[in-house]
Amino acid sequence: MRQLGCGTVVFVNGGTAVRPHPDRVGTSVAFAAESACGQLLHDALQAENIHVAQLIIPGAITPGDPRKDPDVLADALWQLHTSRGPYRTFAEPLDA
């Protein structure tokens, strides 16, 4: 990507990436670390036209769900790539 002068890296995580859960200690710790790494990459590579983004999908990917259907999520990932917006985007609010 650096040689090309552009690119996109997308991290996809569950809600425990931003809100730890006592019943999901493993993903709470692992996703938090991955999120921190992604944020650092986002900040470090932005000036090189390399976009790093994260999509948080709270709960399960659910066919037919207006926010978490696989096709809806695929579109959200495409939008993260093309819009080059902020680092973190939520498929739906965490409290939903």
Indicate where each model-derived feature is located.
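The alpha/beta-hydrolase serine catalytic core
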Residues: 1-2, 86
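Catalytic loop of short-chain dehydrogenase/reductase
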Residues: 2-3, 7-33, 39, 46
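C-terminal helical subdomain
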Residues: 35-40, 46-96
